[in-house]
Amino acid sequence: MLHVFQKEFNTFLNSLIAYIVISVFLTGIGLLMWVFPETSVLDYGYADMQTLFTLGPFVLMFLIPAITMRMFAEEKKAGTIELLLTKPLTDWDIILGKFLSGWLLVILAILPTLIYYVSVYMLGNPPGNVDTAGVMGSYVGLILLGAVFTSVGLFSSSITNNQIVSFIIAVFLCFILYTGFDSLASINVWGEWSSWLEQLGIIYHYNAMSRGLLDTRDIIYFFSLIVLMLLLTRIILGSRRW
């Protein structure tokens, strides 16, 4: 697994993908937080990180599939996937190595936004008038969300040899998992089932963590979704051995 992880992460670094992803994420979030009037912290009149944690998931929804779309699709198209599968590596070594390298890149893109937190902290009146617990909970949620999107992207890449198709499938699945169930639950036809339906979606658990209360049920939900997507990837990858 370590070999695959190092190979994938070095590929990111050598192809400039890592630098592009981090730059695009920080620039996009920076513009939303400090420049664009409708979302700027400076126009809110109070210190708040809501822009990052509300719009960040939608930025990641496109950015992460762009990272993961090549992970299996490129190897399938080049015919190197069979060579990879013949090496003394288990399917899980390959899957986890690729997943962890992608997730690490996402984390490295998110961590520099702590600079924005420091800026907002200093802008508070008085300085420090920020819901730090909520911010930390939101960061945990955003990092776990990045892991879910990475696992979705990896699965999408495993079912096709076309990177563009992989990207489109991943964006669609991420969007459905993030907002789909919440939108479905808002339709006034489900009655008492609407609450249950809402809890199936990512945004319900993500918003719960943003309140600063790290409930084990929310954490279990995220990891369950990650495991599910990696299991589906394992099934697809395993089918190529037969």
List each language-model region with its residue ranges.
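Transmembrane alpha-helix boundary and packing residues in multipass membrane permease domains
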Residues: 66, 70, 114, 118, ...
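Alpha-helix N-cap/start motif
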Residues: 91-92, 163
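Hydrophobic alpha-helical transmembrane segments
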Residues: 1-63, 115, 217-242
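Secretory targeting signals
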Residues: 30-34, 46-59, 101-161
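Terminal transmembrane helical anchor/hairpin motif
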Residues: 39-50, 166-236
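Transmembrane helix boundary and interhelical loop/hinge segments in multi-pass membrane proteins
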Residues: 65-85, 99
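Hydrophobic alpha-helical membrane-insertion segments
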Residues: 16, 22-24, 101-110, 169-184
